[in-house]
């Protein structure tokens, strides 16, 4: 897999299927696919285009997309298959996107023999791409990323926490216990939080996921 070619496909798809619709969606363009989970016509169009182009790049590969999975949960079995599989979240942060906010991302992973071989996150607003290849490293817009050192003081660390852990940190702060890290407001977009973690803007992330 040529990582740059995949990056180009992601960028071109965002330009054609996503960006023309930011702040341009009507109520009919947005629906609730499950309780609290939204999908827009941009999500569906982008996933369809990415799927087509990825399968053209690698004939015989399969696609597990967030929106196709919502319609057919049995597709999750593809994640455990031995063949090449593309996993796509066409718009991570759909709620933000549906409200015309700029905090959203496109996320793609490539699996083979049941293991993640590469992954891409693209910020269509900043036109920034971060990607990683198993055993080789990670890059953002061509610049190799390195792991930040562990020498920072705890009160210099900032990150994103879930409700439970955020409440516990708030109690520590209210009690005047020091030192403590800084909690930032949730982006409501994991992809953008992942990017800022990779770029060293955030030092920790914590989530609690429940498959629906």
Label each region the model flagged.
Residues 1-91:
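N-terminal subdomain of lithium-sensitive/metallo-dependent phosphomonoesterases centered on the IMPase/IPPase/PAP
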Residues 18, 43, 54, 94, ...:
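Residue-level signal for inorganic ion chemistry
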Residues 65-67, 142, 188:
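Short loop/edge segments at beta-strand edges and connector loops
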Residues 66, 122, 208:
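Conserved residues at the C-terminal ends of beta-strands
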Residues 79-139:
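DPxDG-like acidic metal-binding loop motif
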Residues 117, 145-147:
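Short, isolated positions in well-ordered beta-strands
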Residues 149-212:
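An extended, acidic
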């Amino acid at each position: 897999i040529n990582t740059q070619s995949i990056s180009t496909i992601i960028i071109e798809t965002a330009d054609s299927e996503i960006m023309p619709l930011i702040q341009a969606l009507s109520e009919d363009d947005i629906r609730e696919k499950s309780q609290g989970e939204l999908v827009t016509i941009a999500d569906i169009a982008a996933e369809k285009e990415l799927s087509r182009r990825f399968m053209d790049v690698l004939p015989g590969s399969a696609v597990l997309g967030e929106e196709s999975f919502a319609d057919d949960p049995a597709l999750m079995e593809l994640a455990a298959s031995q063949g090449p599989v593309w996993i796509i979240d066409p718009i991570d942060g759909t709620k933000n996107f549906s409200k015309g906010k700029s905090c959203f991302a496109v996320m793609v992973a490539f699996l083979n023999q049941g293991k993640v071989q590469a992954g891409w996150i693209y910020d269509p607003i900043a036109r920034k791409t971060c990607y990683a290849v198993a055993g080789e490293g990670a890059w953002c817009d061509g610049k190799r990323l390195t792991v930040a050192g562990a020498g920072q003081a705890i009160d210099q660390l900032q990150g994103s926490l879930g409700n439970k852990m955020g409440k516990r940190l708030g109690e520590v702060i209210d009690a005047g216990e020091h030192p403590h890290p800084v909690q930032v407001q949730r982006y409501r977009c994991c992809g953008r939080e992942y990017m800022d973690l990779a770029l060293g803007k955030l030092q920790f992330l914590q989530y609690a996921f429940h498959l629906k």
